A protein has these predicted regions:
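Conserved beta-propeller blade signature
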Residues: 7-11, 61-65, 106-114
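Short, solvent-exposed loop/turn segments at conserved positions within beta-propeller repeat blades
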Residues: 17-27, 117-121
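Short loop/turn segments that connect beta-strands within beta-propeller blades
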Residues: 33-37, 75-79, 128-132
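A short beta-strand motif characteristic of beta-propeller blades
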Residues: 38-46, 80-92, 133-139
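Repeated scaffold domains used in trafficking and secretory/extracellular systems
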Residues: 1-5, 47-58, 90-104, 142-150
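A short loop-to-beta-strand structural motif that recurs across blades of beta-propeller domains
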Residues: 27-30, 70-72, 123-125
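Blade-level signature of beta-propeller repeat domains, shared across WD40, Kelch, NHL, RCC1
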Residues: 117-150
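Short loop/turn segments immediately following the C-termini of beta-strands
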Residues: 13-16, 66-69, 115-119
Length: 150
């Protein structure tokens, strides 16, 4: 997966074989200079396997990705990794949503949209990053393959 907002960041999933854990390698995040295509740095994501679906918040300060045990958040330099959602997802998107705080004030919230790849693959969950809670569920007629906003 790749994020390119102000810099090119590449998420490498490593090797993950659920039947042979001795061959597994941890995932990593690399920063590539977009002008000369040289590696600026690479950081191993400790105890993270099969990382995929890298997305960024609008300010490029926080990154989110899926891995074998759920959805994770990290700083844009690969530090401070924490698990946000503890079920396996293979779809991940972010969105900023507005809402009325009162008659004259509009608030904004960063949302993650994920699926449950194993338990309910026809369901999309909306997760509010500010409150760390699920705030909506969308059920569709078939397995979720992708999420797009228009």
């Amino acid at each position: 997966s790749v994020v390119w907002i102000s810099n090119l960041k590449v998420l490498c999933k490593g090797i993950y074989d659920p039947n042979n854990s001795s061959s597994n390698t941890e995932s990593s995040l690399s920063k590539i200079d977009p002008w000369d295509m040289e590696l600026d740095w690479n950081i191993t994501l400790s105890n993270i396997y099969n990382a995929q679906n890298l997305v960024s918040d609008v300010s490029d300060s926080k990154y989110f990705f899926t891995a074998i045990n759920g959805v994770y958040q990290m700083n844009n330099d690969g530090t401070s990794i924490s698990q946000k959602i503890n079920f396996t997802s293979d779809i991940l998107e972010t969105s900023i949503e507005s809402y009325a705080v009162n008659d004259t004030t509009i608030g904004y919230a960063n949302m993650l949209f994920v699926n449950d790849a194993i338990g309910a693959n026809n369901t999309i969950y909306k997760y509010n990053l500010a409150t760390s809670t699920f705030c909506d569920t969308i059920i569709v007629d078939s397995p979720v393959k992708d999420i797009n906003f228009y």
